[in-house]
From Swiss-Prot:
GO terms for molecular function: orotidine-5'-phosphate decarboxylase activity. Homodimer. Pathway: Pyrimidine metabolism; UMP biosynthesis via de novo pathway; UMP from orotate: step 2/2. The keyword Ligase does not apply. The keyword Translocase does not apply. This is Orotidine 5'-phosphate decarboxylase. Belongs to the OMP decarboxylase family. Type 1 subfamily. Its EC number is 4.1.1.23. Keywords: Decarboxylase, Lyase, Pyrimidine biosynthesis. It holds the Pfam family OMPdecase. Coiled coil: none annotated.
């Protein structure tokens, strides 16, 4: 059973291990999980994941793997061996890539991390997709990739809260992980398709990723407690 009692995932979006651990030391693993992304992982190597696990946190390794099937599957296997709770891959890598990852995790005798597919990045709008040759609305592309992810046996999807209602209706078994969450009154920064924590949960999101409103707060522990209070009503 998970030690974390909320759907919150705090993004440790820092350039150094020291800065990330300074924030982690102010957070309660019972109130949030943590996300390790590309910058932090690259600057501190795999040891950051083990250190966070030792502190009691469940870790979402957000590296968005996207490569040929075997290479991606081996990367997912390595992440599982670190003890991560969740790992993600780009759905646009295709069905065979996602199936290879699923099959590799199925070989494990120990705990398996949640395998999550990335659909359309929350910073992208229709004009951004058009720029890479996709003349579709973000919502339509999300639904296309979601169907592919379900066929591959993925555990869930990263998606914006605006796509969550349609995804829950079409794919109720998939767990939805939503970035771009901003408590009421927060700046939007570079995330375009956003909702508040309560709105996102009501829309069908299962896990909420929150970064700067907590990580850049004067008192991160207090900021986290405020978000917990908001979602608990």
């Amino acid at each position: 059973m998970s030690a974390c009692q909320t759907p919150l995932i705090v993004a440790l979006d820092f350039p150094t291990r020291e800065a990330a651990l300074k924030l982690a030391d102010q957070l309660d693993p019972a109130l949030c999980r943590v996300k390790v992304g590309k910058e932090l992982f690259t600057s501190s190597a795999s040891g950051i994941v083990e250190t966070l696990c030792d502190k009691g946190f469940e870790v979402f390794l957000d590296l968005k793997f996207h490569d040929i099937p075997n290479t991606t599957a081996m990367a997912v296997k390595a992440a599982a061996e670190m003890g991560v709770w969740m790992v993600n891959v780009h759905c646009s890598g295709g069905l065979r890539m996602m199936v290879a990852c699923r099959e590799e995790l199925a070989k494990r005798s120990g705990p398996q991390p949640l395998l999550i597919g990335v659909t359309v990045l929350t910073s992208m709008e229709r004009e951004d997709l058009a720029g890479i040759g996709l003349d579709v609305d973000p919502q339509e592309q999300v639904l296309r990739l979601a169907a592919l992810a379900e066929k591959a046996g993925m555990d869930g999807l990263v998606c914006s809260a605006l796509e969550a209602p349609a995804l829950k209706a079409a794919h109720p078994s998939l767990q939805l992980v939503t970035p771009g969450i901003r408590p009421a009154g927060s700046a939007q920064d570079d995330q375009r398709r956003i909702l508040t924590p309560r709105q996102a949960l009501d829309a069908g999101s299962d896990y909420l990723v929150i970064g700067r409103p907590i990580s850049q707060a004067a008192d991160p522990a207090q900021a986290l407690a405020a978000v917990v209070a908001e979602i608990r009503g």
